[in-house]
Amino acid sequence: MKNAARLTALLLAIAAGPTFAKQVRIPITRIKDVPVKCADEPLGTCHNRWHPGIKAVMDADLGDLVTFETRDAFDNPFNRATTPADVAAPNLNLIHPLTGPLHVNGAHRGDVLAVTMIDVQPGPDHFGYTVAVPGFGFLRDVFTEPAIVHWELDPLAKNGKTRYATSKDLPGVHVPLHGFAGTIGVELGLPEIEAAFLREDQLRRVEGFVLPPEPTDAVPAALCGPHGPARDRCLRTIPPRENGGNTDVKQMVQGTTLLFPCFIDGCGLSIGDVHWAQGDGEVSGTAIEMNAIVTVKVEVRKNLAAKYGNWPRLESNRSGVLRELEPDDFVATMGIPVKPAGVVMQPERWFHSDAQLTPLTNQSEDVTLAARDALLKMINLLTEPSTSPAPKPLTRVQAYLLCSVACDLRISNVVDVPNYVVSDFLHLDVFEKSADGNEDGDD
């Protein structure tokens, strides 16, 4: 984002108001610029489960500016020396380490917590990564081997220019900073915890892909660990829910306001899993992941949670906030719900038998299959020498990981039966240009 520093200063000035709001900081402990593990945090400012019994670590008043220091989504296991083999079996019990909860004074159950994003900066190590983990991601049946892209993150904007992430693993690619919190939310109340547990457990029992409560490596261990009183109801942070959480909505950038229903007094705001940038869909399961420093303003809209449907919302009155996320140049593929005969996708098994599905090459009204088709076509486009807009054609795994940070899956229609359309838009401005205006590497 151009002039990001100026925008941050403007947002800070607006947020502070004429009387200057108090500024609050929730710190974490770092060793040589890298955060210590969530479970080892001596300040007690980290947790990796949702439960209203998790105690607030800081208080803030309405209108305060609050800075959260955060870990990355996997609790910082990867670094510049990490190999693909090191990515093969990460500990998913550690996901996501969150900073908080923050108790907002004057906020009560039934209110709406308004959280305005003021600033998102990478942590002091200026390192990010994108990974493909076996068994996880949208195309986990196609990409079965581990992979990693290591990113160097521009520490400062120079002369108002755009800040980029670059990688030796993707030569000729630079991804601009559009930072946001992939996971941001409030604590659920006990009734909401029980409702979420029951519906997810019901889904798990019919072979849905669900991660149930897991006390191993849960933080705080005293509440959620193997001997904790809430070990069977401390919910995992991977699925988004009524409280927000791991929504991975890339539009939650500077100048937007997130609206969360408060399910407990004080709301219990937590932030983590921050991204330098992400494509709509986050198809590999990761964006450009980083530890970060996030500043927000907290306000309350009294007694509006029920009117807002007890569900999160996102809004902005800052002109051009979405336009800044759109590419100047793009190429897009279009997908419909088609597949090779013999391939059966797991979600369809809930509605049809394998005998019905196996011979089909077309399925009806299936947005997921259409998205898969569009993504596979984009990967083919990026890897085919005659069509690839990249400086050099990418390998298939390079293309998959690039799509996770720079391609936007968009639903184009859900009416033209049987073939709904999903389009996949690639931001061509992620490819560096040479002095003659061509992509680097062009003849």
What does each model-found stretch correspond to?
Residues R205, L211-S364:
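Conserved mixed alpha/beta catalytic, RNA-binding, or beta-rich assembly cores of soluble enzyme
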Residues A73-A85, V120-V131, G266-W276, S412-V415:
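Short, Lys/Arg- and Gly-enriched loop/turn segments at beta-strand edges
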Residues G17-A21:
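Sec/Tat signal peptide C-region and signal peptidase I cleavage site
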Residues E41-H51, N91-T99, L235-N243:
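Short, structured beta-strand/loop micro-motifs enriched in basic residues and often containing a Trp
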Residues F68, V112-V115, F260:
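A generic structural signal for residues embedded in beta-strands
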Residues Q23-P90:
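N-terminal, Lys/Arg-enriched amphipathic/low-complexity engagement segments
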Residues D119-V253, L259:
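Intrinsically disordered, low-complexity linker/loop segments enriched in Gly/Pro
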